[in-house]
Amino acid sequence: VSLIRKRSAGQNTLKTHVISVMGSCGERDRGKRPMMGEIVDKHTDLMILTNEDPYGEDPWQIINEVAKGIKHKIENENFWKIMDRREAIRKALALARPGDVVIVTGKGAEENMMVGNEKIPWNDKRVILEELSTSDSRD
């Protein structure tokens, strides 16, 4: 919330772009999903919707419910739906230019992603560092 406030206050002078990677957890707060999409839509320049702990829900359904709140972006132009979370992070990092801010939300310091009843090893920080390292070697 504080980042959003700072972003709104400096909207005219801020020369950076804010790029978000976000999802929504399955099996809870379905009614909040479009609201989450709307908030991120209003306060970021580019956004990527992705998978985040779907539990037993269809992850595409979750992504599409979040997308219902997006009114100011055009799919595949400044907003994307990418199921694979690593691919979503990779896309965000590829879009970023010097001075831009990439925000990856949802998983925080969690070490697993819940898919059905299965815990899949996952750590956003590790994946981000791996992708940055890989992109540095490609440049």
What would you call each of these model-derived segments?
Residues 1-139:
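ATP-dependent carboxylate-amine ligase
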